[in-house]
Amino acid sequence: MSLIIRQYHADDIPAIRDIYAQPKAQAGTLQLPMPSLAMWEKRLNNVPDGVYPLVAELEGKVVGNLGFVIAANPRRRHVADIGMGVHDAYQGRGIGSALMEKAIDLAENWLNVSRIELTVYTDNPAAIHLYQKFGFEIEGTAKQFAFRNGEFVDAHYMARTR
């Protein structure tokens, strides 16, 4: 398996859109069904400072994505927020772990980020386990955090500090 974690390129945008068009990736994120290519092009062709979009490429195909966003407030520049998705067909193969390793390396060894935050639905045990494996702890739970498939879902706030 030749897995590469790298910064995204503009030609990755259709593959990133396809990741979030998958049922599991949609259910685990805040993305809406049927994501448009135009929306993803707008989002990823105008990446602001402090945002580092990463992709996981397996044998030439983009199969995962992680957004790493450093807080804009000067008093919180030591904090980053992450969100990630892995194509349904490639879940359970270590893609999420590889993306997380790269994000932590970027945070701690290059950007002086000492706190990484994320939000995860409480009914996503695989993602919660992944984050806990990398030292994330649940700091709280938001009731009715999002609306998905006709009902409200709760989410955990998780963070990792060094």
Tell me what each language-model feature is.
Residues R93, S97, N109, T122-G140:
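Conserved active-site alpha-helix within GNAT-family acetyltransferase domains
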Residues E117-V120, Q132, E137-V153:
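Conserved catalytic-core motifs of GNAT/GCN5-like acyltransferases
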Residues V55, G67, D81-G85, G94, ...:
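Conserved beta-strand segments that form the floor/walls of ligand-binding pockets within enzyme
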Residues Q7-D11, P23, T29-A89, M100-K102, ...:
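Acetyl-CoA-dependent GNAT
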Residues E151-R162:
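Terminal substrate-recognition subdomain of acyl/acetyltransferases
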Residues A107-T119:
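Conserved GNAT acetyl-CoA-binding A-motif
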Residues I4-D18:
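A short beta-loop-alpha structural element at the N-terminal edge
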Residues R17, Q26, A103, L111-V113:
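Compositionally biased, non-globular sequence tracts
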